[in-house]
């Protein structure tokens, strides 16, 4: 049922990052460029004069180009030519050199793919400089969003989980495409 507290699709369809990147690079795709510009534009003022900027779950790598900021280090669970560093955000290990050195973390439409968001946020705090920032942009689950997720059988949601439990994942973590689209609603 669309209005349920929980919906877990039987088959999660994988998203093709390569196709997404190809669409993004296509100069004719003006609608997607406009959407991405709107999605990222609010971040620009927070990135001024920042040196160490890390995006977790960078996917097609659009942020670096849309924000026109070469300082952004793109990370993802899978290695692609445009990704600077392969990192599983659920385990977030940036090494000792970056502890207390990161100015800004960006998580754009990726937090709902993290099986333990509270644990991730706690780990991120170890790497942030004093007064460092975490910029999060994640979908809010509305009636219409639930409807589209249900029809597409792409990703699910659950409001039944304890999102603040650092020891328990909120969904199975063996599939990088698993997600809980209720994360933004539950955290914020």
List the predicted regions and their residue ranges.
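Conserved alpha-helix/loop element of class I SAM-dependent methyltransferases that forms part
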Residues: 30-51
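Short catalytic micro-motifs in class I SAM-dependent methyltransferases
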Residues: 109-110
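Conserved class I S-adenosyl-L-methionine
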Residues: 135-166
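A short glycine-rich, Lys/Arg-flanked "PGG" loop and its adjoining helix->strand segment in the class I
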Residues: 118-133
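Class I SAM-dependent methyltransferase SAM/SAH-binding core
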Residues: 54-94
């Amino acid at each position: 049922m669309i209005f349920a507290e929980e919906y877990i699709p039987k088959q999660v369809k994988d998203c093709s990052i390569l196709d997404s990147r190809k669409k993004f690079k296509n100069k004719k795709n003006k609608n997607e460029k406009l959407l991405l510009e709107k999605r990222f534009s609010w971040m620009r003022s927070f990135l001024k004069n920042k040196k160490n900027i890390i995006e977790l779950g960078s996917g097609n790598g659009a942020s670096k180009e849309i924000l026109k900021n070469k300082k952004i280090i793109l990370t993802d669970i899978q290695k692609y030519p445009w990704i600077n560093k392969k990192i599983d955000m659920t385990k977030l290990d940036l090494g000792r050199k970056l502890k207390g050195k990161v100015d800004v973390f960006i998580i754009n439409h990726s937090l709902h793919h993290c099986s333990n968001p509270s644990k991730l946020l706690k780990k991120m705090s170890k790497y942030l400089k004093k007064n460092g920032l975490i910029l999060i942009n994640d979908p809010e689950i509305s009636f219409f969003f639930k409807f589209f997720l249900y029809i597409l059988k792409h990703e699910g949601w659950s409001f039944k989980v304890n999102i603040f439990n650092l020891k328990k994942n909120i969904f199975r973590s063996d599939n990088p495409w698993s997600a809980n689209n209720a994360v933004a609603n539950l955290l914020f």
